[in-house]
Amino acid sequence: MAVRTAGLTQLLAELDTIAGVSGAEEEVAEFVKGELEGCYDAFHRDALGNHFFTKEGTNPQLNLMLSAHMDEVGFVIHHVDEKGFGYFTPVGLHDDRTLANQVLTVHTEKGPIQGLTGGKPAHIVSKEEAQKAPPISEIYLDFGTRDREETEELGVRVGDYVTFERPGQLLNGGRLFTGKAVDDRAGVAVMIEVMRRLRGNDLETSVHAVATVQEEVGIRGAGPAAFRVKPDVALAIDVTLAGGTPGIEDRQLPVKIGEGPAIKFFDWAPGLGMIGNNVPKRLTSRLVAIAEEHHIPYQREVLFNGATDGWAMSLSGEGVATGTISLPSRYTHSAIGCVCPEDLAGAVDLISAFVEEFKAPL
């Protein structure tokens, strides 16, 4: 592990371990608050659960907002049958292909409970069934119990959130970190490191680092957060889809893992209600100039079928000039999301330089 990225990788590993499905981000928030101790002058928590960490600048009229969402995609228990098996529904966008034969953790009032995602053995599935992934409606959790009463004695109840049971790790000690919640704990780690780097600096702008909630279920937290801050400029920090793997053409996903953070120019998700963000040219030009001036490797990104906190922030109040710094990621919205710590370190460099040089509205 490179010395430059060792601390960032360890921070990401700790963040990834914490459970924080959309709507249940409290443990992540407490961890973030602890990691940012000494890095902010003011703190606020709003009714939704967004956490605001403000480092005050010398110009009270200048405000810059950073956002990274704390929540991860997961599941929620919606039924326990008479035999004690639990059924669940997704919280956020999931790929049913990833769910078979997994260990999941149910986060009950009594504590975490493990269950196995069960289904028919391969020996008895039909040819038609063997050709497709079972839909989530046919997948259940096996707790090793004999009936509903025993399952409920474990603490499992309708409404309990569920996550993958999998520790994050640096893959083979190499260049990729893989975990269940790199979307967007990778962005949270970057935001924490930026605030740490800025800790002793006298800045003209106030910096509002906001750990947001419920991004994965409709980008619900960032809009109210930006409404509170009323920033001159905002930057979302989030993962993006990386190509470079078998079956994906470069023209589909040209951003590559390990080639630096991506400066987003445009994103659009028509399937999610036509949401997206056309980043103002004056902002992308400034980010590109800073990356080149500081010799920070970067990529240019246009993304279809995806969006970030940037969409909601851009539409807040009278409108906010909003960009996104993207962290290339493989296998997003699965238990094995991957990012490259070097890309994260580059994002820290780029965002820190942008903040330090931000002295007037764009």
Question: Model-derived features: where do they sit?
Answer:
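N-terminal hydrophobic/helix-forming segments and targeting peptides
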Residues: 1-362
